[in-house]
Each structure stands twice: as C-alpha cells, then as structure tokens.
Amino acid sequence: MVQLQVFISGLLLLLPGSVDSYEVVKGVVGHPVTIPCTYSTRGGITTTCWGRGQCPYSSCQNILIWTNGYQVTYRSSGRYNIKGRISEGDVSLTIENSVDSDSGLYCCRVEIPGWFNDQKMTFSLEVKPEIPTSPPTRPTTTRPTTTRPTTISTRSTHVPTSTRVSTSTPTPEQTQTHKPEITTFYAHETTAEVTETPSYTPADWNGTVTSSEEAWNNHTVRIPLRKPQRNPTKGFYVGMSVAALLLLLLASTVVVTRYIIIRKKMGSLSFVAFHVSKSRALQNAAIVHPRAEDNIYIIEDRSRGAE
C-alpha cells in the first residue's frame, strides 16, 4: 500500500510538466506586437481575460485586459488593446509601443461554463531591440608599391698636401685617400588593408534576415522557426485521464484484496466453529452412556427385591 501511494504521488507531481508548454512570440522594441488567441463561438460567446504569468487554476493573475464577450470592459494600461472581432472569438492581445520589460509569460483564459472547461493558453513573449542598419560600402584595395634599391658611390680623390713650407727640396707629396661610401636603400612594400563593412537590414521576425556585403551582392539567410508547442489543454486532459484510470485501478485492487482477506477470515472461523461443535457432541455422548448403565443397575436391583 505504501508503494502504491508513493507511485501515485510521483505521478501527480509529473502531471504539471505536461501542462507547462507554451508558444513563443517575438517582437521588436518600439513596434506593436500581437499575441494570438481565439476560441470557437459555437457553444456561445463568453468572457476572456489576459494576465501576466502562467495561467492559474482560476481567473487570471495580474490582469491586463478583460472582455465580456462583446467589448473590452477593463484594461490596466492604454497600451493593451484587442483589435480583433471579440464577438467572433478573436481575442488576440495587441501591445502598442512594446518595450524590453514586456518580455515574459502571458495567459489567455477563455471562461467556458463547467468543471475544468476553461480554455487556457500560455505564451512566451520575447521583445528584442531593433538591429541598426548602415548603407553598403564598397571595399577598397591599394596595390603594394615596390621601390628599387638605390646605390650612391663616390670616387676616391687624391689631394696633395704639404706639411711645412721651406726652402729645401720639397718632400714627396703626401696624399690623402678617401674611401668610397656606399649607401643602399632597400625596397619596402606598403600594402593597404582591405576593409569590408557588411550591412544588415532589420529582421522582420518572420524567419528571414537579409545580409549584404556589397551593394550588388545580397543573399538571404533563412532561420528555421520553432515548431509550435503542443496544446496544453490536450495534455491536461490526457494527464487527468491517466490519473483517473490509475485511481480506478487502485480502488479495484483494494476491493479485491479486502474480499480475499475477508474470505480467508470466514473460512478460519467456520473451521473453528465446526471443531468446537464436534468436541461438544463427543462430550455429550460420553456423559449419556454412563447414565444408561446406571439405569440398568437400578432396574436389576428392583427386580431382585421383588423376588
């Protein structure tokens, strides 16, 4: 029994996991964003509320807007509005001039009469800043320039010099030699860097982002959209059905177990009663037999006295 209770408790804890699925809606800061929510009016027109956070068990928490099925009867701010036809079941929420703080969970609750009949849908809103754009720029390239080495050479010259002036025979001329000096300029190359400034256009949040590297060369990158999440109402009903089936199975198991235990107890009691009755019958038979023998002796004594 304890193991069954632990199993059922674990199952009930796992049930909310199937309900916590929600659809992601994206928006851009400064632009209006619409969170879709519709219901079928075949069963009648009913009230609807929008709130922040996950859908509670009843009503809406942090109510943003409320309708009576035909028009808006309450709104917490002028930025919240329902632009669809409310009487036809279109109760999509539009947030004007969205800001970054609008990101988070939103609950659309359509109140349908009956137990657990409300249509609850939870959405995750992601508001991101607009991506700035810049005009396309054409890359420029400068070819490297090369200079040839330049060599400057000087010829040696002999300059006659005399150390002193005298009347004597002049001494041999002294010469001064200049060695040539060679200066070489090595070639150097200058290369200009090529800069490319790709430009981006703002994403329209429908899965397409356009990127351009040149004014004449554009290509489009497709971003896959996230698959829509499963319907939380169906998950809730499936979880409740599984829980009800397990509870029914548990109840039937308890009833069968009690029936078997009671049958065993009744069988043991009948056996004890039969044993007791049998022992009492044997005791009664043993008591009656000596009394019969006493009666015989009394009759014989009386017959002898008569003689």
Curated annotation (Swiss-Prot):
This is Hepatitis A virus cellular receptor 1 homolog. Belongs to the immunoglobulin superfamily. TIM family. One of its GO terms (molecular function) is virus receptor activity. GO terms for cellular component: apical plasma membrane; brush border; cell surface; extracellular space; motile cilium; phagocytic vesicle. Residues 129-177 are annotated as: Disordered. Residues 139-175 have a biased composition (Low complexity). Keywords: Cell membrane, Disulfide bond, Glycoprotein, Immunoglobulin domain, Membrane, Signal, Transmembrane, Transmembrane helix. Glycans are attached at residue 206. The gene is Havcr1. It comes from Rattus norvegicus. Residues 22-124 form the Ig-like V-type domain. Its main location: membrane. Residues 1-21 form the signal peptide. Phosphatidylserine receptor that plays an important functional role in regulatory B-cells homeostasis including generation, expansion and suppressor functions. As P-selectin/SELPLG ligand, plays a specialized role in activated but not naive T-cell trafficking during inflammatory responses. Controls thereby T-cell accumulation in the inflamed central nervous system (CNS) and the induction of autoimmune disease. Also regulates expression of various anti-inflammatory cytokines and co-inhibitory ligands including IL10. Acts as a regulator of T-cell proliferation. Disulfide bonds join 37-108, 49-60, 55-107. Expressed at a low level in normal kidney but are increased dramatically in postischemic kidney. Expressed in proliferating bromodeoxyuridine-positive and dedifferentiated vimentin-positive epithelial cells in regenerating proximal tubules. Pfam families: V-set. Residues 22-235 are extracellular. InterPro entries: Ig-like_dom (IPR007110), Ig-like_dom_sf (IPR036179), Ig-like_fold (IPR013783), Ig_sub (IPR003599), Ig_V-set (IPR013106), TIM_domain-containing_protein (IPR052331). The chain crosses the membrane at residues 236-256. It is a single-pass type I membrane protein. Residues 257-307 are cytoplasmic. GO terms for biological process: phagocytosis, engulfment; positive regulation of mast cell activation; response to lipopolysaccharide; response to mycotoxin; response to nutrient; response to testosterone; response to wounding; response to xenobiotic stimulus.
